[in-house]
């Protein structure tokens, strides 16, 4: 039996998801997508998990995206090329179109985040990049399309002209430029990357877990709604939060001048 493609660990309320094919710069084949889908299912179901760190093994790449050698073999065998989203493909729904994942995902990026790797980054909630990180959607140079969300998310996260420049040319973006455009939260030297990620996950874990889930859901679901409609829309995790013991505990702890004890209930 071949080795697993993804390492999955949990510690202190944080799930660590590592794409583990460093010899091919963590290129994603169908088996990796299948493993990741099972992991995302577990992350959502496990109430002890309050945050996720997604990264790639080694120091050369977060992920260079689709395994193009596998794609070439599939093309030769008559398997239809992919288009938008992961419907009908291995590992559906993938993170890029798993719109109900309520836990915050932190991308830890070293080296290349290209194609589907960059699309994963765009789907994360917080992005911490090393100074050597490089981002690009090179599909246009390969007769492909950034169908795992790149063509949709990049124009939502950048000014339109800036996004179109990268989408239509496949040009690369360095970490400093990504920070300037607001695509990443912090850029740090590689030696400081793990500590910076830990600082962010510590903050997430200290926060009320139901509040985190409610805020993520409401913020992402409402982003394209008219403001009046956003206020009147019902949000599942906000209904859970406002009826929770944690909603009482947080205020009580503040009044009693102590740290809150979150139960997620």
From Swiss-Prot:
Keyword Protein transport listed: no
InterPro entries: ClpP/crotonase-like_dom_sf, EnCoAhydt_DpgD, Enoyl-CoA_hyd/isom_CS, Enoyl-CoA_hydra/iso, Enoyl-CoA_hydra_C
GO molecular function annotation: enoyl-CoA hydratase activity
Catalytic activity: a (3S)-3-hydroxyacyl-CoA = a (2E)-enoyl-CoA + H2O; a 4-saturated-(3S)-3-hydroxyacyl-CoA = a (3E)-enoyl-CoA + H2O
GO process annotations (BP): fatty acid beta-oxidation; vancomycin biosynthetic process
Keywords: Antibiotic biosynthesis, Lyase
Domain of life: Bacteria
Pfam family membership, one: ECH_1
EC code: 4.2.1.17
Pathway participation: Antibiotic biosynthesis; vancomycin biosynthesis
Enzyme class: lyase
Function (record text): Involved in the biosynthesis of the nonproteinogenic amino acid monomer (S)-3,5-dihydroxyphenylglycine (Dpg) responsible of the production of vancomycin and teicoplanin antibiotics. Catalyzes the syn-addition of a water molecule across the double bond of a trans-2-enoyl-CoA thioester, resulting in the formation of a beta-hydroxyacyl-CoA thioester. Physiologically, DpgD could act as a dehydratase, facilitating the aromatization of the DPA-S-DgpA or DPA-S-CoA intermediate. It can use the non physiological substrates crotonyl-CoA and beta-methylcrotonyl-CoA.
Family: Belongs to the enoyl-CoA hydratase/isomerase family.
Protein name: Enoyl-CoA-hydratase
Lineage: Bacteria, Bacillati, Actinomycetota, Actinomycetes, Pseudonocardiales
Gene name as annotated: dpgD
